[in-house]
Amino acid sequence: MELLIDRFHLEIPSDLEESKFQQWEELKRTPVQLRAVNVMRLWLEYFCDTDDEKALDLVEAFANNALIYRHVNGMRGMLMRLIRRCRQGSGNLNRKMMQPKMQPKPLLPPSLSQLCFLNISPIELARQLTLMESETFLRIYVPECVNKAWASSDARHRASGVVNVISLHNHITGWVIETILNEENVTQRAAITSHFIAIANYCYQINNFSTMWAISSALNCASIYRLNATWALVSRKDLDIFSEINQIIQPTRNYSRYRDLLDRVNPPCVPFFGLYTKDLTFIEDGNSDSLWSDSRLINFAKRSLAADVLYEIRRFQFVPYNFVRVPSLFEFLDLHFKPRMSDEERYERSLKLEPRQSSSPYGGNYHRHDFTSYDMIPDEYFMKRLQENGFT
């Protein structure tokens, strides 16, 4: 902010002829000052946080003391209104959201006192998961996404919103894995797997790509993927749905199918945040902060690339979902989100449920290769980047 204020106070060149002062004033200083004030306005509208007290003080002092020029004097009142609104906690306009009018009625089981996973509608589970994901995603402030703040040693303080999104994603993935592995009966395991596929499919339909991705990642993990006897009892219809979901998140051509889908989607939407951390990490690590020819020159191309990613994040923070929050289902999910097994323990549990064998004993109309031909192509580089950014 200090540099922006310094830019506003553009000094008159020492060698400027008096006869050319008016021209310099109109063509140089006035446009520079208007742009500087406009950047302050944009920051107050979209990026300021109530914690940015020092920066707010600077802008307030600037507005009271510097905006005396006739061509920007009208902006003083506007800046002061935005400062007051930001300090009241409503200055960030991307938090002022449109609210759909109609709320769909929750699809609840007969009894909420003793909830069982398979007795809860996959549609309603998808809605409640979407509310969880959306509320967490909407709490992310853009500054948290700059300079890989989420991967810093003080990430919990600098990027709490991003950290919470990553944590929720990991909890959902672990919940899916352990819910399947905790079932001894193979028929019930297959039913649970189909239930999760139905949840992922409805999440896809309502643009909750974050939960969809988390469920797909869980079902594709080694502990679940190898359960041939379980997959043999999953219907062909459900397998086709799961295959289509996997096609959407394939890494081919830098996840082009998912990115194309995201470009066309209308909010509300919960995007998969892991792809944003991948893109921002690539931009941060692959581009210098300044131009190689002069370290004093800022590399604006790098900032422009990052701004494109940040703009897309903000685009999905305008419109929230309008589902009815069901407290008992939130409590059910919170209770089961607590992981109880390590990755090694999960794999050992998987081997205990279905020991290694050359082929599925269920055979019949199902062959594992029928499914894997559609399955997601592994992207080791992407998975490594996700793990570095906290995703499991």
PLM region spans:
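Eukaryotic small-GTPase/lipid signaling interfaces
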Residues: 1-392
